[in-house]
Amino acid sequence: MSGRGKGGKGLGKGGAKRHRKVLRDNIQGITKPAIRRLARRGGVKRISGLIYEETRGVLKVFLENVIRDAVTYTEHAKRKTVTALDVVYALKRQGRTLYGFGG
């Protein structure tokens, strides 16, 4: 290894990728049955049709906040990989302590 630290076969500094996949509308990947299963787990018997889009919106905002905090922890530690502990600390910061993943 020629002094590249941990990692392996890094060629250069990265730069722009040729074909960058455009990420859009991924929230639709949270399907109606998936939302229904989560509601069932929470003890819900009947679900209004309007719930699905509302749930997607709320989930998107929640995940954006958690991911933003987790990435902030990662950047502060001068790392490029978000670890499970970063997510645990981000959740703890928002008052949603999660046990079982270290920390």
Curated annotation (Swiss-Prot):
Entry's localization field: Nucleus; Chromosome
Q: Which InterPro entries match?
A: CENP-T/H4_C, Histone-fold, Histone_H4, Histone_H4_CS
Residue list for modification N6-succinyllysine: 32, 78, 92
Compositional bias (Gly residues): 1-14
Membrane recorded as keyword: no
List, alphabetically, the Gene3D superfamilies matched.
Histone, subunit A
Q: Which residues bind DNA?
A: 17-21
Q: Does the keyword Nucleotide-binding apply?
A: no
At what positions is N6-acetyllysine found?
17
Q: Which CDD domains match?
A: HFD_H4 (cd22912)
Listed under GO cellular component are: nucleosome; nucleus
Which residues does this entry mark as bearing N6-acetyl-N6-methyllysine?
6, 13
Give a Pfam family name: CENP-T_C
| Modified residues annotated as N6-butyryllysine in this record | 6, 9, 13, 17, 32, 45, 78, 80, 92
Q: Which residues carry this modification: N-acetylserine?
A: 2
- Keywords, comma-separated and alphabetical: Acetylation, Chromosome, DNA-binding, Hydroxylation, Methylation, Nucleosome core, Nucleus
Write down which residues bear the modification named N6-(2-hydroxyisobutyryl)lysine.
6, 9, 13, 17, 32, 45, 60, 78, 80, 92
For the modification N6-methyllysine, which residues carry it? 21
Superkingdom, natural source = Eukaryota
Q: Which residues carry this modification: N6-glutaryllysine?
A: 6, 13, 32, 60, 78, 80, 92
Q: Which residues carry this modification: N6-propionyllysine?
A: 9, 17, 32, 45, 78, 80, 92
Give the family this protein belongs to, as stated in its UniProt record.
Belongs to the histone H4 family.
Report the function annotation for this chain: Core component of nucleosome. Nucleosomes wrap and compact DNA into chromatin, limiting DNA accessibility to the cellular machineries which require DNA as a template. Histones thereby play a central role in transcription regulation, DNA repair, DNA replication and chromosomal stability. DNA accessibility is regulated via a complex set of post-translational modifications of histones, also called histone code, and nucleosome remodeling.
What protein does this entry describe?
Histone H4
Q: Give the species.
A: Styela plicata
